[in-house]
Amino acid sequence: MSIHTRRRPYPRLLAVAGIGVATLSLAACSLGIDDETPSSSPSASDAAAPDASGSDDAQALGGTVVLRTHDSFAVPEETLAAFTEATGVTVDVQSSGDAGQLVNTLVLADGDVDADVVFGIDSTFASRAVDAGLLAAHTPADQPASAEQYELPGEAADALTPIDVGDVCVNIDDTWFADRGVRPPETFEDLADPSYADLFVTPGAATSSPGLAFLLATVAEFGENGWSDYWQRLMDNGTTLTSGWSDAYYVDFTAGGGDGDRPIVTSYASSPPFTIDEETGESTTSALLDTCYRQVEFAGVLEGSQNPEAARALVDFMVSPTFQQILPENMYVFPVDDSVALPPEWQQFAELADEPLELDPQTVAENRETWLREWEDVVGG
């Protein structure tokens, strides 16, 4: 059996160290996409350039717009070149750690931010960004109707525009369980069952974005009075913690392409398309959709932008088909525009949960640090 495991970008690690900011001028250089990125990804040239801005006067804008984002931002050069061609605006990308670091940097700057647009604030940190007054109101005129379900509640919807969506879910190595004649797990409770002792690995909640999402999933599932007891049962059942997703998936997970011995891992609903058996054309892994926690990424115009019209045009561009169509195979997330065709392997093996676990962003903002301290007490005990 020949298994092809295609590496995906490292997920967004939570802030644990200093912040390095790298600036890429997309008018002149490549974003350095992974060599294993599929060549079949739709090109920006496949879409009409006028879609790139949402403004009839876009070509007259000109200048530069500074985009502050996270380190996992991976958009082909030609995609943003389409925006530049349509608007005359050059996009200067500045990366700043993960989603948590991104928000922290902007909040600590206290309005003194040399940027125009932010992309990559996720639903976990959105309320903090809105409450800090970081964002100017803007709603794209051509926002897809399907994006409305991902909007933040209340006035926050005017500040941040949903761009992509993904589910963090428990993934299993189907081949491992089939070869041993073992019934695969299906639920959170199964992970704490002695039948699955020493089989689960997850990135830690304090050092990893998917790890935090899994913690939040357990809070949503078991409630504020029950999640810590569940975690105690997980640890008593031999759960292994890693510092990040990449170690959990590529080192410890049996289907991660290494020598791992754990057939259950915290990953993404979009992971199965990247573990396809080249002989059968079938994925050897699956996501347990009843364990999924929904994450939405947003973009917004920053208050104090030096080029607000161009900033608004860039946010508009991010919900256009030109940008939405490159998300699955470049950033491994689902577009919020459900009219965009997904790659064939995504259509077959990637699926968003029908009823994902979610917590109100404000509730997360108010309790995140407390939950993390309590989590560390459990796993460190």
Q: PLM features: what roles do these ranges have?
A:
Residues 136-144, 160-161, 189, 276-293, ...:
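Short beta-strand->loop
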Residues 210, 216-290:
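Ligand-binding pocket segment of bilobal, Venus flytrap-like solute-binding proteins
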